Structures are given as structure tokens and as C-alpha cells.
UniProtKB/Swiss-Prot annotation:
Gene3D superfamilies: 3.30.300.30, N-terminal domain of ligase-like. Mg(2+) binds at V537, H539, V542. It comes from Bartonella henselae (strain ATCC 49882 / DSM 28221 / CCUG 30454 / Houston 1) (Rochalimaea henselae). The keyword Magnesium applies. This is Acetyl-coenzyme A synthetase. It comes from the Bacteria. The gene is acsA. Its EC number is 6.2.1.1. ATP binds at G387, E388, P389, D411, T412, W413, W414, Q415, T416, D500, R515, R526. It holds the Pfam family AMP-binding_C. GO terms for biological process: acetyl-CoA biosynthetic process from acetate.
């Protein structure tokens, strides 16, 4: 296959931190002598007690991952305190509100005071090292303060995206046994108010029925909206922050002390609590941010991700601040008040590096070029893509229309579990191909493997595995190490299985082809099909449900549901809409059923297993070759499913 290659622009090549020769040299060193390589690069953060041990990892047996295990440091200290002498007056955080007329600029000195005050409030309310703190906030500066305050005192934060339902919030509270929640009365997004506190109150009631009791709720006042209040449990942040001390010593944290738990969808339905620890994570977040974005002092860097996702953790908060960068946080959406908002912000704040998701790119591409062309965007130097594979058409539009043909696009592949970038171009070292994540980052050893476990060489396609550890790797699933082993290390023994399919071309470039397990990637958000199916069958009208993904021009993947109703229940448009609302209520606003097909029966094997492979083909409108259907118990079911498919506008 021949793809157009975009060479490295001269202006990038001239000033890049990493060129092609350095990439090759460092990569070989990182693979051949990882101990030495990571010993050297572990010095990118400051240590209270230096490490003498670097790498102690095994992907076999009980699976154990430790990096810098005898070192002592603190994440908040590295993200704030160490910059104060030389960068105290530098802008650390630019906040752009949902309202285009609202913004704030916070220096490193001011960030230090905000975080110390926040940390002291937590301590005054009994939060201590090792406690779990749930954060349910929209994109306001206090969300970053909360994360950094937890890191400062050694509390473990669990940030939940402020779009998840009370049921989803409760599940996460119960799983990590969190008794302290930080939220706001309301949030603002896209000109709409989101009732955060109401969702938290409901979640607390659900958690209590499962014997997990939330003792304290800190509430940030974002709007003047009404609020339900529980005396003795709830307290206002603004009432305490004004008379709290502006100094709080950073807790001495062992390198392997937990930093945060972040929940991601699992194929069994129950979300997985991905656990990241202190030092290895920060070293990797800092290093990938610096070299992938070729970050130079003084640049304005904007990652549009929400703090509820790993991208917001690694590349909005921890990575940039560890590198003394100026990071921009945006409260709103790309389409409010109109489709030009992103580009107006780029001009307003003179953004140099812009990192967003293919879903946003496709939506804005669909809105037409006029919204882009009314802005200048001359400050832009680099563009980035994250969350899902970017299709070549969107890549080309991003490059030519947004980047004016001169901004390299950093198409980054990584996961919640990996902590940071795994396959990515480096601006000064990597010629680009539209739609390819290109080459592995330092220390990342990739293998493509077939279904039988054979390693495939050269130009090929198969399942993507990683054969050795890296510092940013998750350590376990919270309270479920056995599930951690089974999920990631049992498919191919001694290897981390990513769950993604991958193609390697003749130039050694990698192309991610999508999930090979039962996880959907909807607008860059991972949703488990089992989780959606469980939500559907919890409705009294639903007997059985199967959920698959299908190609969606904006979201990348859409959610297609096949539903069998209870005896005596007839399909109707009213029920169709009710089921859409029901799933949103159970999981959250990101789980919108795009296609609902009522079916008298689902295709099953003789042992009763639903043949999702066939349903995927039908959902993709690709039913001419359904493959082997000899194991179907009732083959005639297929004809009905094809005749009543809901996706006729899709071309195969």
C-alpha cells in the first residue's frame, strides 16, 4: 500500500528537541538497555530521596510492575514548588470559560497558594495519605487544584467525568470505597447548566444502599443556581478557602505509592479501576509531553480533553505542569456559541500547540471551512490528535485547513492503562502519513500477533501487544489484581495485550485498526458493550439485548443495539425513545443509542451464545459475507435482521 508521506517542515527540523538520528539512538538504547535509559531520564523530576533501583517488572505469573521503587518524591512538588524560584510569575494555567467573555490566568505562584489552601482544607476535614477522594467537576480551575491538592497530601484521587449518571458515579464510589467527594453546585458546558450536586446526592444514596457511606461533600459554587443541602455532610469551598493557610508541606511519597484511580470501561460490564502510582507515571507523563509536543519554554499549550479522562490527567494537568508549561483549560464545547469557538480561543490566547480528538475534528469539518477561515491561527506550530484513530480525510482537513499546511499532526495512540503516549510521531524526527500513529515512543516494544499467538514480522496485520514494561504503565486494577492479569496478560502469556488491532506497513509505521474486544470507542470515549447491554436489560420491557459498534461519520463508532422485547410487549417509537433515555440515565450522556433495532430473536449458537460477529456485519451493512453460520441454532433469524436493519444509509 502506498501512502503520501509528509516530510518534516524545515522550521520544525531546525529547532526540534529530537531529530531522526537522536530518535534512533535513544530508541535503541531504551530497548537494549532500559535500566540505563530510564535511570538517566528518571532525573527529569526532582527527588527527596534519589532512587537506586530503576526497573523491577515481570509480565509473567502474578505480574509485578515497579519503577524507581526506593525513591521518594511528590507529584505536586514537581508540578509547582520546584518552578517557583525561576518561573513563579509565569502563567501556569489559562482558564477559558464556557462564556467567551470569561477567562483567568493563574501564575505558578498563585497556583501554589490555591493548591496549598485546597490541601489544607482537605487536611482540616480529616483527609490523609492513602484516603480516596472522588472528584466530580466540570472544567474549572478548582478541578486542577483538587487533583494537585490530593497529590500534595498523598490522598488518592478518583476523577469522574461530569457526564456520568448517578448510578455510574455510585459504582465508582463503592468500588474504591471513597468517603469524601468534591463537586460543584452546577457546571456549565455549551451554554447549559449541569446539576452536578444533584447527581452526587443521588449517587450517595445509591452507594449507601451498598454499605459505602460518604461522610463529607465539598461544594464549589460555580453558579447561583439552587442547591439541595445536607447539614453536617456538605460544606462550601469558598467559605473555608479565604481563611485557610497558603502553605502546606508536600508529603514524602514513595515512588510506588498510588497517585490516582481512573475508571475505564471493561468488557464484562463492571468498569475497571486503573491504578497509577507516583514516580513512574510522572516521569513518563513529563517526558512524553516534552518530546512528543516538542515543548519549548514560553509556548502556550492547549489540550482540549476533560479532566475526567486520562488525557486530561496526563496532558492537561500533570505532564505540562511538571515541565513548567503554560497549559490552557477550556470549560466549554467546540460548537458553543458557534462552530468557530476553538479557533477563536487559539487566536485569543495565541496557542502554539493544539491537542484534540478526531470526533471534534470531524464535527467541525462537517460544519464547513468558513468558521475556521474567519480566524488567523498564525500562532499554531503543532497539532495533535488523541482518543481514537483519525481517518485520513479528517487528518488531511486538520492539516490543510486548520494548520495551513505547515503544522505537523501528532496522531498519538495510547490508553488509560498506559499512562502516556505509546505510538506517536515526534515532530522533528518523523515524516507523517495521514491516519498512521507512526512509530513507538522510547522504551515501547511492540509486537503484532495472530490469533494463535504467533509473532508476525514485516508488513502485516494482527493484534497489538507490548512485550516489556515502561514507567507510565498501570500497576493493577484497584482491589482486583486477578482481573488485571486476566484482562491484559492472559490472552498472550508474558505480553501486555492492548485489545487493539494494528497494521504495520512496509516502512515500519503502525496503523491502529480499532478494538478487537467488546469495547466501543465512541467519540474517543471507551464504552463496554456489556455495560450498555446490562443497562438495556434492566428495563422491564427488554428481554435480551446485544450491542455492537458501527462506522459513524462523526463519532468514529456509533452504538447499534439489537433488542428482543418481553412477551406481550410491542415495539413502538415511544419505547424506542424511552430506551434511549433509560441507557443515558444508567450510564451517562456519552452512552446514546444511535440505532435501535427491535428483533424477535437474536442469532445464537446451539450453546446459546449470541453471535456478535454476525450482528457487527449487519450493523455495518456488510451482510453479503457473514462467514461461517453453520453453528447457528436458527439460521432464519438472519433474514429478519437484515430485512429490518436500521442502517441503510451506510455504505459497506
Amino acid at each position: 500500500m502506498s501512502e503520501k508521506i509528509y516530510p518534516i517542515p524545515d522550521n520544525i527540523k531546525k529547532n526540534a528537541l529530537i531529530d531522526e538520528e537522536t530518535y534512533q539512538q535513544w530508541y535503541q538504547e531504551s530497548i537494549n538497555d532500559p535500566e540505563s535509559f530510564w535511570a538517566k531520564h528518571g532525573q527529569c523530576i526532582e527527588w527527596f530521596k534519589p532512587y537506586t533501583k530503576v526497573k523491577n517488572t515481570s509480565f509473567n505469573g502474578d505480574v509485578s510492575i515497579q519503577w524507581y521503587e526506593d525513591g521518594i518524591t511528590n507529584v505536586a512538588y514537581n508540578c509547582i514548588d520546584r518552578h517557583l524560584k525561576t518561573h513563579g510569575d509565569k502563567i501556569a494555567l489559562i482558564w477559558e470559560g464556557d462564556n467567551p467573555y470569561h477567562d483567568k490566568k493563574i501564575t505558578y505562584n498563585e497556583l501554589y497558594e490555591h493548591v496549598c489552601r485546597f490541601a489544607n482544607i482537605l487536611k482540616n476535614h480529616g483527609v490523609k495519605k492513602g484516603d480516596k477522594v472522588t472528584i466530580y467537576l466540570t472544567m474549572i480551575p478548582e478541578a486542577a487544584y483538587a487533583m494537585l491538592a490530593c497529590a500534595r497530601i498523598g490522598a488518592i484521587h478518583s476523577v469522574i467525568f461530569a457526564g456520568f449518571s448517578p448510578e455510574a458515579i455510585a459504582g465508582r464510589i463503592v468500588d474504591c470505597e471513597s468517603t469524601f467527594i468534591i463537586t460543584a453546585n452546577q457546571g456549565l458546558r455549551g451554554g447549559k447548566q449541569i446539576n452536578l450536586k444533584d447527581s452526587v446526592d443521588h449517587a450517595i444514596e445509591i452507594a449507601a444502599r451498598q454499605n459505602v457511606h460518604v461522610d463529607q461533600v465539598m461544594v464549589i459554587r460555580r453558579t447561583c443556581g439552587p442547591i439541595h443541602w445536607v447539614e453536617g455532610r456538605d460544606f462550601w469551598y469558598h467559605e473555608e478557602v479565604s481563611h485557610t493557610k497558603t502553605d502546606c508541606p508536600a508529603e514524602k511519597m514513595n515512588a510506588e505509592d498510588p497517585l490516582f484511580i481512573l475508571y475505564t470501561s471493561g468488557s464484562t460490564g463492571k468498569p475497571k479501576g486503573v491504578l497509577h502510582t507516583t514516580a513512574g507515571y510522572l516521569v513518563y507523563a513529563s517526558m512524553t509531553h516534552k518530546y512528543v509536543f516538542d515543548y519549548h519554554a514560553g509556548e502556550i499549550y492547549w489540550c482540549t480533553a476533560d479532566i475526567g479522562w486520562i488525557t486530561g490527567h496526563s496532558y492537561l494537568v500533570y505532564g505540562p505542569l511538571c515541565n513548567a508549561a503554560t497549559t490552557l483549560m477550556f470549560e466549554g464545547t467546540p460548537t458553543f456559541p458557534d462552530n468557530g469557538r476553538f479557533w477563536e480561543i487559539v487566536d485569543k490566547h495565541q496557542v502554539n500547540i493544539f491537542y484534540t480528538a478526531p470526533t471534534a475534528i470531524r464535527a467541525l469539518m462537517g460544519a464547513g471551512n468558513s468558521f475556521v477561515e474567519r480566524s488567523k491561527r498564525t500562532s499554531l506550530r503543532l497539532l495533535g490528535s488523541v482518543g481514537e484513530p483519525i481517518n485520513p480525510e479528517a487528518w488531511e482537513w486538520f492539516y490543510h485547513t486548520v494548520g495551513n499546511n505547515h503544522c505537523p499532526i501528532l496522531d498519538t495512540w495510547w490508553q488509560t492503562e498506559t499512562g502516556g503516549h505509546m505510538i506517536t510521531p515526534l515532530p522533528g524526527a518523523t515524516p507523517l502519513k495521514a491516519g498512521s500513529a507512526t512509530r513507538p515512543f522510547f522504551g515501547v516494544q511492540l509486537q503484532i500477533i495472530d490469533a494463535e499467538g504467533n509473532v508476525l514480522e514485516g508488513e502485516t496485520e494482527g493484534n497489538l501487544c507490548i512485550i516489556d514494561s515502561w514507567p507510565g504503565q498501570m500497576r493493577t486494577l484497584y482491589n482486583d489484581h486477578e482481573r488485571f492479569i486476566q484482562t491484559y496478560f492472559s490472552t498472550y502469556k508474558g505480553k501486555y495485550f492492548t485489545g487493539d488491532g494494528c497494521r504495520r506497513d512496509s516502512d515500519g509505521y503502525y496503523w491502529i485498526t480499532g478494538r478487537v474486544d467488546d469495547i466501543l470507542n465512541v467519540s474517543g470515549h471507551r464504552l463496554g458493550t456489556a455495560e450498555i447491554e446490562s443497562a438495556l436489560v434492566s428495563h422491564p420491557a427488554v428481554s435480551e439485548a446485544a450491542v455492537v459498534g458501527y462506522p459513524h461519520t462523526i463519532k468514529g463508532q456509533g452504538i447499534y443495539s439489537f433488542i428482543t422485547l418481553m412477551e406481550g410487549t410491542a415495539p413502538s417509537e415511544e419505547l424506542h425513545q424511552e430506551l434511549i433515555r433509560h441507557v443515558r440515565k444508567e450510564i451517562g450522556s456519552i452512552a446514546i443509542l444511535d440505532k435501535v433495532q427491535f428483533a424477535p430473536q437474536l442469532p445464537k449458537t446451539r450453546s446459546g451464545k449470541i453471535m456478535r460477529r454476525i450482528l457487527r456485519k449487519i450493523a455495518e451493512n456488510n451482510f453479503d459475507n457473514l462467514g461461517d453460520i453453520s453453528t447457528l441454532s436458527e439460521p432464519q433469524v438472519i433474514d429478519d435482521l437484515i430485512a429490518n436493519r436500521q442502517n441503510r444509509e451506510i455504505t459497506a
